[in-house]
């Protein structure tokens, strides 16, 4: 679960059209969210408030062997009007999970020159107690595609009482570049990510003809690398990664595959993540070392639960009521008795109207061939199905999510439940491992955290 400050940072990126998925460090973010999710340790409560559209504060208190706390502040030069509190926020926005990688879109130059957020900035600071540990972050947008990110940590337990990392990031539809410098070991780094294919213009997206778009436009292939060099210890670092993300043209379900290689350490890691339904995701990862021949297989899944267990009978349709349908029922109480909502027509970008092209709008997605064109508009069919699936995921009203991951070689099992309890977001989980001596399971982590934000 994201902290409230992390959530505001993501809203800042969305408000300023900054694509996080186009950064090399996030190339395996989907598999990490399902396999390497953190488990709360002890008891923790977080209370946050957005005083204005430009500023917010957060207070955290935890009890893990001793009482600790922190106080944080955030300021944004861009009004964060698209944020919500823990009572109304969607779980898809509050919890790290499957990321749908969108095809590349190049903004028009005239839009870039007049963009009001081309010089936007974000300031963040946190103070921990007891003790004198501090952390800060500055995000300064230099241009529409370039920003400066500075992270600082001040802690008496660190070498020279702290460290600072500077990122100069350039993010475009075709590629992204990062120049990194850290005061720790005087580390210098370079990250690059290149997207194969030709980016689509934003004007083309708003007025495209689906017959002219091939099916592979739903796929995104990205290849990247990172180079590191510690000037003090004269130690180099090198790694590369490949990501392939696509969506099925028949069901609209997305999947992501990645391959990461570290030639210096001889480590190879491959992942496969697929959204098997609107409310479930499965992920697998295989790690192998060419020097030691050590290998490991990790498996994980996440399963969402709907807030409203009653299904809505859409004549021949059977889906869980999304937030949009719930709003419609509130406006028309006479329909609540039978839980029936009229089927709304889907309007495509070229102003053609399609009346419900999906026969059974459930997690399986059965296609009704009598309602789909069998002529040259096959590209239109695939575009409609993928859009319908994504809209259904975004509009679904979920109340909780259950995450599970295990590793065969490490013999570790992690279980995490995150959901909404009244006005709070709750996260609780456990981490179990097998004792190598007694071969009995033992608890490594066990905790619960509460988050409240206005």
UniProtKB/Swiss-Prot annotation:
GO biological process per UniProt: establishment of mitochondrion localization; mitochondrial genome maintenance; mitochondrial outer membrane translocase complex assembly; mitochondrion-endoplasmic reticulum membrane tethering; phospholipid transport; protein insertion into mitochondrial outer membrane
Entry membrane topology: Multi-pass membrane protein
Top-rank taxon, per record: Eukaryota
Keywords annotated in UniProt: Membrane, Mitochondrion, Mitochondrion outer membrane, Transmembrane, Transmembrane beta strand
Pfam family, one: MDM10
GO CC, one annotated term: ERMES complex
Chief site of localization: mitochondrion
Listed InterPro entries: Mdm10
Localization terms from the record: Mitochondrion outer membrane
Stored PANTHER family: MITOCHONDRIAL DISTRIBUTION AND MORPHOLOGY PROTEIN 10 (PTHR28035:SF1)
Entry's family note: Belongs to the MDM10 family.
Quaternary data: Component of the ER-mitochondria encounter structure (ERMES) or MDM complex, composed of MMM1, MDM10, MDM12 and MDM34. Associates with the mitochondrial outer membrane sorting assembly machinery SAM(core) complex.
Annotated domain remarks: Lacks alpha-helical transmembrane segments, suggesting that it resides in the membrane via beta-sheet conformations similar to those predicted for other outer membrane proteins and porin.
The protein, known as: Mitochondrial distribution and morphology protein 10
Gene name linked to the record: MDM10
């Amino acid at each position: 679960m994201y902290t409230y400050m992390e959530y505001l940072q993501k809203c800042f990126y969305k408000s300023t059209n900054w694509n996080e998925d186009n950064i090399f460090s996030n190339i395996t973010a989907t598999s990490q969210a399902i396999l390497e999710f953190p488990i709360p340790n002890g008891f923790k409560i977080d209370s946050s408030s957005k005083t204005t559209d430009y500023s917010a504060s957060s207070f955290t208190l935890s009890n893990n062997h001793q009482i600790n706390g922190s106080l944080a502040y955030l300021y944004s030069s861009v009004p964060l009007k698209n944020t919500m509190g823990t009572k109304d926020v969607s779980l898809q926005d509050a919890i790290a999970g499957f990321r749908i990688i969108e095809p590349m879109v190049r903004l028009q130059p005239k839009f870039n020159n007049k963009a009001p957020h081309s010089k936007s900035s974000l300031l963040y600071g946190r103070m921990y107690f007891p003790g004198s540990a501090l952390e800060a972050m500055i995000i300064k947008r230099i241009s529409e595609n370039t920003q400066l990110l500075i992270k600082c940590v001040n802690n008496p337990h660190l070498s020279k009482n702290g460290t600072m990392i500077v990122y100069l990031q350039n993010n475009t539809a075709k590629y992204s570049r990062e120049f990194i410098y850290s005061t720790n070991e005087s580390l210098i780094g370079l990250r690059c990510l290149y997207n194969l294919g030709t980016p689509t213009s934003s004007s083309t997206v708003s007025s495209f003809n689906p017959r002219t778009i091939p099916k592979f436009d739903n796929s995104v292939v990205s290849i990247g690398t990172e180079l590191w060099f510690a000037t003090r210890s004269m130690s180099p670092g090198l790694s590369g990664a490949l990501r392939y993300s696509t969506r099925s043209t028949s069901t609209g379900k997305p999947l992501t595959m990645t391959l990461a290689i570290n030639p210096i350490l001889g480590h190879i890691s491959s992942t496969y993540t697929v959204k098997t339904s609107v409310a479930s995701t499965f992920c697998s990862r295989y790690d192998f070392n060419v020097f030691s021949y050590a290998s490991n297989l990790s498996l994980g899944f996440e399963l969402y639960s709907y807030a409203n267990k009653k299904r809505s009978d859409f004549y021949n349709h059977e889906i869980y009521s999304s937030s949009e349908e719930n709003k419609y029922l509130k406006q028309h109480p006479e329909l609540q008795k039978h839980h029936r909502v009229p089927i709304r027509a889907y309007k495509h970008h070229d102003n053609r109207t399609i009346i419900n092209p999906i026969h059974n709008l459930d997690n399986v997605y059965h296609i009704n061939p009598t309602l789909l064109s069998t002529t040259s508009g096959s590209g239109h069919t695939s575009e409609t199905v993928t859009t319908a699936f994504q809209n259904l995921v975004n509009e679904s009203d979920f109340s909780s999510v259950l995450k599970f991951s295990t590793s065969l070689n490490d013999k570790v099992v992690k279980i995490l439940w995150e959901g909404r309890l009244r006005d709070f977001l709750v996260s609780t989980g456990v981490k179990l491992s097998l004792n190598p001596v007694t071969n009995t399971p033992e608890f490594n982590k066990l905790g619960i955290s509460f988050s409240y934000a206005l």
